[in-house]
Design a protein with these regions (language model features):
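RNA/tRNA-interacting regions in translation and RNA-turnover enzymes
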Residues: 1-362
Length: 362
């Protein structure tokens, strides 16, 4: 006996007088889509790889048998809403070295982005930092199998290589990203501003949303093309014939994002992260990683140059290490030398008794 998505029950039976012990299934009948397996036929019988045998577990055959560890992260640790953040904690806990990957972008002979895109941030009190890079010669298509599998394992639906890259970077770094189709960025200008009376936007989910004055939007020279930190606009989405892309990696005011998401009834994974007040220093490595993946997947040419507008960056904080008070509060007897070692494992610098708090650590 088997159950298919949608409540379809498969049992032994007879079909045209012959015994039937099963059913040949299409992607759709298995609850899968062409986004997951782009080289299959959605409505036809799904032909599996030649090396599988009758009786093999379908999850193993299609690479859907990865082990997923679910962590419950408290709201005061947004730095752990990412693979890198969790790796840092795991490295410290198991006393293993943390291997950092520095994204490398080669650029191309396609020129510079500076004569193609202009960015203005009049709502600087709501946008701490706005970073953008451009990719031309884009070839939209399915992502490679390894990328689709990693996204699916994290509950993210694969869409296409460019959109998948932005989602993958968000999982790695905890930094939400967005990609705009440059064709639809009027006047080659991006403006981070507050919405005005009577403005509307149709978001990527197909819903027309009236905007209240004061909501933070990403606009071009004429109109809103995205809800900042929440969801992009349908009028600038990445489609099959997109050839030039603007990558956005920004840091928005968490309170503003939360209020807009609540007012519109539109909470997304991106808005949930921005509400926690992310580290503004993430925007550069995230956009660099996205461009590195573009080059690795050979799906476009990264233009030289990075637009990086910084309005507010938190000042470095320093704390005094007080071993006696810490042990009193925790009811422990941890030696001071061990405390310093624990902090250093967490990549928190300590000089004497002065702790320098990293920008990523709340």
């Amino acid at each position: 006996n088997s159950w298919l998505p949608g409540g379809v029950h498969i049992t032994k039976g007879k079909l045209r007088g012959e015994k039937s012990n099963g059913m040949l299934c299409s992607l759709k009948e298995l609850g899968l889509t062409l986004n997951d397996f782009p080289y299959a036929i959605e409505d036809g019988i799904w032909i599996l790889e030649e090396d599988c045998k009758p009786g093999d577990d379908i999850n193993t055959v299609i690479g859907n048998d990865d082990t997923v560890v679910d962590f419950e992260i408290t709201n005061n640790r947004p730095d752990c809403y990412s693979i890198i953040g969790l790796a840092r904690e795991a490295a410290a806990a198991f006393h293993r070295p943390m291997r950092h990957h520095e994204p490398m972008v080669h650029g191309s002979a396609a020129g510079s982005m500076y004569d193609k895109l202009d960015v203005e941030v009049p709502a600087e009190h709501l946008c701490n930092r706005y970073t953008a890079r451009m990719v031309t010669g884009v070839k939209i298509g399915p992502s490679p199998k390894w990328l689709r599998q990693r996204l699916r394992a994290n509950g993210v639906r694969p869409i296409n290589n460019i959109v998948d890259i932005t989602n993958y970077v968000m999982l790695e770094y905890g930094q939400p990203m967005h990609a705009f189709d440059y064709r639809y960025v009027s006047s080659g200008k991006i403006v981070v501003r507050e919405s005005t009376q009577g403005e509307t936007i149709t978001t990527l989910d197909g819903n027309l949303r009236p905007l209240k004055p004061g909501m933070l939007v990403i606009a071009d020279g004429d109109k809103p093309i995205g809800l900042a930190g929440i969801m992009g606009g349908e009028n600038s989405e990445i489609v099959a014939d997109t050839t030039t892309v603007v990558f956005e990696s920004a840091n928005f005011n968490g309170t503003s994002i939360r209020q807009t998401a609540l007012a519109l009834g539109l909470r997304t994974e991106a808005s949930g992260k921005f509400e926690k007040n992310l580290d503004p220093m993430l925007t550069i490595p995230a956009v660099q990683r996205a461009c590195e993946l573009v080059e690795q997947l050979a799906c476009g040419d990264v233009l030289d140059g990075t637009i990086d507008i910084i309005n507010h960056v938190p000042q470095p904080k320093q704390l005094e290490l007080e071993p006696d008070r810490i042990n009193q509060l925790l009811g422990t007897q941890i030696p001071e030398a061990d405390m310093v070692e624990y902090l250093r494992r967490l990549e928190i610098p300590v000089e004497g008794r002065t702790i320098s708090v990293p920008s990523w650590r709340p």
